[in-house]
A protein has these predicted regions:
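Periplasmic OmpA-like peptidoglycan-binding domain that tethers envelope proteins to the cell wall
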Residues: 24, 51-123
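Periplasmic peptidoglycan-binding/tethering modules of Gram-negative envelope proteins
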Residues: 1-45, 78, 82-85, 118-123
Length: 123
């Protein structure tokens, strides 16, 4: 029989408290799942993207978003054994909102780190 092409994908979303880059414990299982995915597909590299809401100066938010992305990368490397060279932390500040910054709920959704991976493989 011919090999069957399959697609595997995973999406990580970690939200943050206001003005914080501390990854909360509730996201550790999600990080574990991403780490297992990366171990299964060992040639994959991933951009870990940090974001903020629009509260505060734009340049501060750019730095905060970078710190958020780096916090997730640090956990993946130090707690879950992923090689640092496979991960790139990128801070996008407030430039890519997923919700309105006019509401408390919207701002909470915008304070996030995202990583999305998709891979095609044969079985």
């Amino acid at each position: 029989p011919l090999p069957v092409a399959k697609v595997a994908s995973i999406k990580l979303k970690v939200n943050f408290d206001f003005d914080s880059s501390v990854v909360q414990e509730q996201y550790f299982n999600d990080l574990q799942e991403l780490a297992e995915f990366l171990k299964r597909f060992s040639d994959l590299q991933v951009d870990v993207e940090g974001h903020t809401d629009s509260t505060g100066p734009e340049n501060y938010n750019a730095l905060l978003s970078q710190r958020r992305a780096e916090a997730v990368v640090d956990l993946l490397v130090n707690q879950y054994g992923i090689e640092a060279r496979r991960l790139e932390a990128k801070g996008y500040g407030e430039s890519q909102p997923v919700a309105s910054n006019d509401t408390l709920e919207g701002r909470a959704q915008n304070r996030r780190v995202m990583a999305t991976l998709e891979v095609e493989y044969e079985e």
